[in-house]
């Protein structure tokens, strides 16, 4: 599933603003629909300003926050920017590994929640960490 922001804003006579706030509702609905349908995360809309890397990165981050798994690209220069946002960083991978390892150790002792580096960790956080590790494994191996 992919989101076409241009089609969406045309159909609803919206003005596609720089902060993309007019896209928030559709992004949320698509992300929910993909999840409810047990589909892969949807792919986010294009950015028309092909020479504006910062705008592209901001848009990609918004898409990622809404659960999108990637970004449609209309220019080759946008591909590495997409990877920059949607590929887990070394820090994210290290943190995810630490979360999973600490939780598995705690779970072996009968605990279903822990504190790690000042953060509460329970099953949803562990599952998210496992998802990050699986994504990193599939993209980086």
Annotate each language-model stretch with its function.
Residues 1-141:
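Expand to "…catalyze enediolate/carbanion chemistry for C-C bond making/breaking, isomerization
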């Amino acid at each position: 599933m992919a989101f076409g922001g241009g089609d969406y804003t045309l159909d609803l006579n919206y003005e596609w603003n720089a902060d993309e706030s007019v896209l928030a509702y559709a992004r949320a609905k698509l992300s929910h629909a993909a999840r409810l349908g047990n589909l892969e995360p949807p792919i986010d809309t294009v950015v028309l300003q092909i020479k504006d890397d910062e705008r592209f990165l901001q848009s990609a981050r918004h898409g990622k926050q809404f659960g999108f798994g990637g970004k449609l690209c209309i220019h080759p220069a946008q591909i590495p920017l997409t990877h920059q946002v949607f590929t887990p960083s070394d820090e994210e991978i290290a943190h995810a590994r630490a979360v999973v390892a600490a939780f598995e150790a705690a779970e072996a002792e009968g605990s279903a929640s822990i504190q790690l580096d000042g953060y509460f960790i329970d099953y949803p956080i562990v599952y998210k960490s496992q998802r990050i590790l699986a994504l990193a494994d599939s993209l980086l191996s």
